[in-house]
Amino acid sequence: MSAVLGYESAREAERVWVDGPGSHRVSCAYKEELLAALHDLKPRRGARLVLFGADVGELAEAERAALMRRMGFVPANGGLMSSLNAWENISLPLAYHAPEKLPAALREVRALLEELGGVGDELLGKLPEHMTLYERRLAAYIRALLEGPDLLVMESLAAGLGPTKRARAARFAEVYQARRPGGTFVHFDA
């Protein structure tokens, strides 16, 4: 049971198994079921979720919480708080979980914005309702990346984006791997 991410659906013989570090595109008939199980680390009755080699159903709550801290998740729509601008959405988790990283974070965020979006500082002041789909995903991706997860799951990497933005989004996996060489990047695009 060495899978970084594994899921067996209760409904059919649907199985998702990601065995090692690197970038993985996953196709899954029960994507929503799997994403829900990842979100709260509680697989549906009869299903099985494996993270970092551990069967989540057999873990105590404290052990599940420890696994959750090793994961980053980016919803298809970005999952940003509507009343916070991009910088506030990006920096809020750091303020709670790693306040010592905040002083250097703005420099790092600016470099990532330039590298991945070519958008510069103007994105940082935007509210989600004024962002494009790509900008929302970019902000959410950067937010997750700054926390340094061992497993980064993107619900959708390129769906709904035009060719230029799809090409930029395709670099998310490359940038993640450069920062977390032993980490695993998973997305669910077809």
Where are these regions (language model features)?
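Glycine-rich P-loop/Walker A and Walker A-like loops and their local beta1-loop-alpha1 context
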Residues: 4-43
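Catalytic "switch" loops of ABC-type ATPases
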Residues: 41, 70, 74-81
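Conserved ABC transporter NBD signature motif
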Residues: 44-57
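ABC ATPase NBD coupling module
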Residues: 56-72
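Q-loop/switch helix immediately C-terminal to the Walker
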Residues: 77, 83-99, 104, 108
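Conserved ABC nucleotide-binding domain
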Residues: 112-129
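Hydrophobic anchor residue at the start of the ABC signature
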Residues: 140-141
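ABC ATPase C-loop
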Residues: 144-145
